[in-house]
């Protein structure tokens, strides 16, 4: 049995097919998944045609430094909030050479299994 979730692999493949048809590239900005989304994407043969780069910004200072999340938003809303995740996506688009950004933040709980699990996601 594969160590990877077939649903995640299937979703990544569907994303790749759609991006390839559009001629677009994607970037990711991840917190609680620790790069798991980018890993799922790069397991797909040919993903270099539609995947640009990943930002793993687990710490708040990394969210500010690498994808431009403001300290004010982090303090006002918290890292696990829609405004911060939207800012992560916007910042990733500005920093990358991509047409689409996928961003996620959440609370990783003690029951997590692997990097791609979050108890609570935004």
Located regions from the model:
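Short alpha-helical segments enriched in small residues
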Residues: 1-121
């Amino acid at each position: 049995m594969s160590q990877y979730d077939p649903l995640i692999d299937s979703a990544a493949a569907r994303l790749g097919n759609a991006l390839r048809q559009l001629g677009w590239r994607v970037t990711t900005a991840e917190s609680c998944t620790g790069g798991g989304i980018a890993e799922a994407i790069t397991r797909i043969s040919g993903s270099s045609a539609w995947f640009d780069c990943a930002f793993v910004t687990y710490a708040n200072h990394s969210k500010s430094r690498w994808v431009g999340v403001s300290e004010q938003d982090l303090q006002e809303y918290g890292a696990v909030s829609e405004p911060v995740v939207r800012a992560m996506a916007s910042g990733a688009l500005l920093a990358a050479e991509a047409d689409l950004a996928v961003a996620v933040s959440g609370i990783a709980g003690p029951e997590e299994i692997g990097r791609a699990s979050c108890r609570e996601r935004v």
